[in-house]
Amino acid sequence: MKTNFKRFFKVIFLFSFFLFSSFLLSAQTSYYVVKGKVIDKKTGKPLQGASVFAQNTTIGEASDSAGNFSLGLPDGGYSLVITFTGYETETMRINRATSQNDSLIVELKPEEQELATVTIAISNEVKDGWAKYGSFFRDNFIGQSKFSKLCVIKNPEVLHFYFSKKRDRLKVLAKEPLIVDNFALGYTLKFAIDSFTNYYNTKSNLFIGYPLFVKMQGDSAQQEKWAENRAIAYKGSLLQLMRSIYSRTLKEDGFELQFVINNNGEDFPIHLENLYGALNYKMDDSTKTVEFYPNQSEVAVIYKKADPEKIYLEMDTTAKKNFQLSDIIFPKGETFFIEPNGFFYDQEDIITNGYLGFKKMGDMLPYDYEPE
């Protein structure tokens, strides 16, 4: 049967984004501690009040008067993000092995103000950018799902919009964190946004940024509703997929993967008899890290335990109604790695289409979310 697996929703992620799972973490999840010190790269002096957090989690703190920080993290991999006003953002990949090393020294480089001024001067900043592009940004950054509709951007004034007619591109920058209240999932999200770029000609988005989650306070009824909604958001997400690959439980968790072959402009699904062999799955017993690379660059992802949202079916009238269909494009010949918590890399090298592209920030859960 011929099936067109292409969908018009496409998004490229450069950070640990939409990573959820049906892989159940144990209540006795083990932790490790990452310690370090934040200093000025030029002077070597400690920086007090630097924001240090594990990206896409609820775990973070500010450095103390000596520039020191200490984070306890559930087993797995993370991207550690360090920000400080007037300095360039620093990121580093960490896992349990990092905690076995000496205290990290994080050197932050002061921003080059002259270069920043010149860059802004020659760009095409849109006057009243929020009034003109705010709705578009919200739909493509927060999303259009039912949970996205319950998100509120608290400080849109920090956003600056730049449109390039020559490149047919809209870029959004922010010097301060963008604050978003997600009343559907019970989180306040603080986004350190490097840039959000929409390419109109390819209908694709590129987001470079670092979210931190803060749990909202609510009464028992609110907490119960948030828990219910988080469980819904958890199903069929990218981390559910990655953790299912990691634990070799794709079928049990409701996923089916197929390779997609294009022949004369038509996409044909190829059923995989030896799924993990086709992914070249390999577990490193010493690091507990899984590496894989699909034999085919385009992989269709079918999730059977939840139907697509009504609004998605209205936006894409060709979509199937009884399962969620996405595809992921992997670069040929590149190996990917998955940590025990579903963190995978390099994430900047994949493109998600279809239902996974439809789900955006409004459906995000933090890495340290554990299903009940």
Task: Locate predicted features.
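Surface-exposed, low-complexity/disordered segments
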Residues: 104-372
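Beta-strand-rich domain onsets/edges
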Residues: 24-33
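Structured interaction patches on ligand/partner-binding surfaces of diverse proteins
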Residues: 61, 88-104
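A short, amphipathic beta-strand motif
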Residues: 34-40, 67-69, 106, 118
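A short, solvent-exposed loop/turn motif at the edges and junctions
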Residues: 54, 81-93
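Short, acidic Ser/Thr/Gly-rich low-complexity loop/linker segments typical of extracellular
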Residues: 57-68
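Bacterial N-terminal signal peptides
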Residues: 11-22
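Short, ordered, surface-exposed loop/turn motifs in non-cytosolic proteins
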Residues: 32-34, 41-56
